[in-house]
Amino acid sequence: MDINDVKNICVVGAGNMGHQIATLCAIHGFKTTCTDISEEMLKKAEAFVDKYLPGRVEKGKLTAEQAEQARKNIRFTSSLEDAAKEADYVIEAAIEVLDIKRKVFADLDKFAPPHAILATNSSAIVSSRIADATQRPEKVLNLHF
């Protein structure tokens, strides 16, 4: 897969890192789905986006059209399966607990298309400790923001 083939991004985890990563992806033109098991976190993440984008317009960092398109590019769901089903690239930003990350990656392996790259945003857990939870260890990597 070539970088130009990446159109759809799934961000797992709607906390501080996750929702900001998802927002950045949406601003840069990717169809982005942010997912979390917590409806409360998803609501907070969506509220952040709805406040952040107009704020960037006010500061002259984005045009109104860019902000509008970014908002159209991002959606939120509590369903990991729904979030991952069309992903070309997945960025996991869940809690720094190895067992949880391994479970998330095992589920992503089932739900994401075979071509999808699965990245962890972890700064403490290397991808080699997660990769074997999938059937695609060669497509698992660390990507830290």
Q: Where would I find each of the regions flagged by the language model?
A:
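Phosphate-coordination loops involved in phosphoryl transfer and adenosine-cofactor binding
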Residues: 3-8, 86-87, 115
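Rossmann-fold NAD(P)-binding glycine/threonine-rich loop
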Residues: 102-145
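A structured beta-alpha segment of the ubiquitous adenosine-cofactor-binding alpha/beta core
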Residues: 56-111
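Generic structural signal for residues in well-ordered beta-strands
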Residues: 32, 74-76, 140
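NAD(P)+-binding Rossmann beta1-loop-alpha1 motif at the extreme N-terminus of oxidoreductases
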Residues: 1-55, 59
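Structural motif
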Residues: 12, 20, 77, 93, ...
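Short alpha-helical
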Residues: 40, 82, 99, 125-126
